[in-house]
């Protein structure tokens, strides 16, 4: 496993031994000079940009905040991502989210009843996801179904997509995309995130293995101004104000 250098910090109230366990598990090497810091607080694990402290910490929270609000008051099956993966009454596809990020869309699909396996190759992001899942699993309200429906695999999608069993009906891709220079200051979260992981320059290579793995379809989330992934025109799309969800059929002929 290749090691990633990041500043590792522990705040008052955090378990003092947890940081070294975290570093060992995810292959992290502490670098006091690094701009990016992974901070263990008494409540959770956070990612911070040390040269821009006003941006605050980035963390995964499935229990409260915007995720809880989206689960309770969002569009439910009417949400664009739900329509794109094909959720219908009596049909809840199994989904592999091959670019999990902070797990937002994966959580929405799991909350609607889908079984979702998240793939995340960046060890820092995987550590944040794992921390959010751990807290979510312990929650009295969402824990019982979250444990059943939402899981994490720390692996590169370029290799993992070939080997996943059983095959999911849907593979979901939401690769990082370079933001327009002219756009307003990118949301703080995106700025911190892109400082860590950059753009997914190899994302075009995901479409073919995703279509070979999915038994029904691949869904690719793109900014409205972005070219289709790998330059391949989509069969259909669900369009929102600022994004579109491009839909591609599976490339595997179903058995007769």
From Swiss-Prot:
Its EC number is 2.1.1.242. The keyword Transferase applies. One of its GO terms (molecular function) is 16S rRNA (guanine(1516)-N(2))-methyltransferase activity. GO terms for cellular component: cytoplasm. Transmembrane segments: none annotated. It catalyses: guanosine(1516) in 16S rRNA + S-adenosyl-L-methionine = N(2)-methylguanosine(1516) in 16S rRNA + S-adenosyl-L-homocysteine + H(+). Belongs to the methyltransferase superfamily. RsmJ family. This is Ribosomal RNA small subunit methyltransferase J. It comes from Yersinia pestis. The lineage of its organism: Bacteria, Pseudomonadati, Pseudomonadota, Gammaproteobacteria, Enterobacterales. The gene is rsmJ.
């Amino acid at each position: 496993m290749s090691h990633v250098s990041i500043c590792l910090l522990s705040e008052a109230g955090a378990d003092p031994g947890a940081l070294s366990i975290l570093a060992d598990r995810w292959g992290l090497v502490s670098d006091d000079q690094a701009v990016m810091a992974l901070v263990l607080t008494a409540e959770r694990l956070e990612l911070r940009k040390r040269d821009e402290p006003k941006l605050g910490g980035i963390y995964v929270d499935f229990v409260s905040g915007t995720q809880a609000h989206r689960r309770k008051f969002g569009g439910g099956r009417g949400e664009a991502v739900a329509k794109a993966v094909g959720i219908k009454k009596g049909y809840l596809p199994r989904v592999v989210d091959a670019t999990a990020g902070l797990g937002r869309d994966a959580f929405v699909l799991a909350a609607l009843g889908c079984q979702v396996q998240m793939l995340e190759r960046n060890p820092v992001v995987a550590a944040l996801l794992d921390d959010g899942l751990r807290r979510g699993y312990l929650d009295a309200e969402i824990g019982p179904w979250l444990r059943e429906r939402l899981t994490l695999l720390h692996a590169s999608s370029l290799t993992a997509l070939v080997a996943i069993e059983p095959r999911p009906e849907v593979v979901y891709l939401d690769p990082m995309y370079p933001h327009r220079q002219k756009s307003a200051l990118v949301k703080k979260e995106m700025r911190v995130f892109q400082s860590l992981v950059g753009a997914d320059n190899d994302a075009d290579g995901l479409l073919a293995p995703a279509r070979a793995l999915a038994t029904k379809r691949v869904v690719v989330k793109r900014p409205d101004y972005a070219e289709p992934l790998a330059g391949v025109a989509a069969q259909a799309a669900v369009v929102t104000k600022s994004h579109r969800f491009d839909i591609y059929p599976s490339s595997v002929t179903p058995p007769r």
